[in-house]
């Protein structure tokens, strides 16, 4: 309960994001708290996605994509971040998600 109060009263976005990412997939929290966390994460999708990539947390990435679909632009940014920071598990997960959701465009090398 105190984490939810800290989430609601804090003005620090990094702290609010951290709490929401830790709490939204826990099963023992009340449904109304989960709804608040999910609403927040939907509004802050790109920072949430990039934070999970930096943490190399594929379980939370899976949980996040079950509540909201990732836009192609945010997904591409996350792929670039995962590759540049050598977050292999997150990179593989993101590439699989991209293949399943958007597919990859075939390049035409004809002359």
Q: What feature does the model see in each segment?
A:
Residues 1-111:
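Ankyrin repeat (ANK) tandem alpha-helical domains that serve as protein-protein interaction scaffolds
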């Amino acid at each position: 309960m105190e984490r939810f109060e800290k989430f609601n009263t804090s003005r620090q976005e990094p702290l609010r994001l951290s709490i929401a990412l830790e709490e939204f997939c826990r099963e023992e929290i009340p449904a109304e708290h989960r709804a608040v966390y999910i609403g927040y994460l939907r509004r802050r999708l790109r920072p949430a996605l990039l934070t999970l990539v930096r943490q190399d947390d594929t379980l939370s990435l899976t949980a996040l994509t079950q509540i909201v679909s990732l836009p192609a632009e945010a997904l591409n940014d996350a792929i670039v971040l995962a590759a540049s920071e050598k977050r292999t598990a997150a990179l593989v997960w993101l590439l699989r998600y991209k293949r399943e959701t958007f597919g990859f465009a075939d390049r035409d090398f004809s002359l």
